[in-house]
Structure formats: C-alpha cells, structure tokens
C-alpha cells in the first residue's frame, strides 16, 4: 500500500510540473502575439446557426489599429470586404461601402481579429496539450468580453505557435469555428 501511495504522489508531482510547463509555454506564446505588428491569415469560417451551418473562406490582414477581412468563397459572396477598426465595422463590395455600426458579438467578419485580440488580452481559463488531426497542439481557452456578452475563444496552436483551429462560444454554445 505504501509503494502505491509513493507512486501516486510521484505521478501527482510530475503532472503538476507538466501543468507549470504548459502555463509557461502558453504565456511565452501569448507574449509573441502581444508584440506582433501585422498578420495575414486565411481560414474557413463556419457560422453555426440554429437551423443550419454556413461556411465562408476568408482572407484577413490585421494590424494593431484595425483589420480587413475579404470573403474568397463561396463564389457568390467573393469580394465582400469587412473592415474592423476598434468597435466599428464597415462592409464594402465593388466600391460601395456601408457603415455596419458597432460590433457587439463575434461574427464571421471579425472572428480572426477577435482571435488575435483573445491571444493578447483574453483571460486564460485553461491550457493543455492535445492532439488535433494527428498533430500535437497547445490548446488554450481564453475568456473575452464583448458588449453583447462573454465570448470563450478556444484555440489549438501548432508547434510554431500558429492557430490551427479555433472555436468561439457564447452562452455555452459554439457559434463560430475557424480552420
């Protein structure tokens, strides 16, 4: 019985050490995101609605002062552009621009910049190692706040620190995914 207890205590100490390593790795990676001055991202965004899912392919250019997201697919929406500056959203297509007002929630137009903001400023709820599609990943769950309520951003990061997959949840429901 004593040998079993010794092994359990040793395992607990090893696991505690792994948790510290993961937290340190997460903080180091988040610091890299805080220092970033520009980013270009491409992703497949799926919006999970009550009755259906809608998928878009987007390209996003981000700087600390704003971001522009352009829909590249499906073809009938290709070229639609959303510009995000602070809390303001402008949608444009074929030269015409329309102020879409204030962003209150995470949406396909702002989820990639939201992901970067979450990596910089979000409250780290959880950090751990996981496998995603055969790749070892660092998984972070980051709590962010929006005027429309809390958004939990869960992101799986590859060995180079780049996001491989992200989920955005509101009211315990996944509303958007990015891959």
Residues of each region from the PLM?
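Sec-dependent bacterial lipoprotein signal peptides
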Residues: 1-16
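N-terminal leader/targeting segments and the immediate start of mature chains
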Residues: 16-65, 76
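A glycine-biased structural micro-motif
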Residues: 38, 79-81, 134
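Gly/Pro-enriched, hydrophobic low-complexity segments
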Residues: 68, 125-179
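An acidic-aromatic
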Residues: 59-114, 173-174
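Beta-strand elements of well-folded, non-transmembrane domains
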Residues: 45-51, 62-66, 73-75, 95, ...
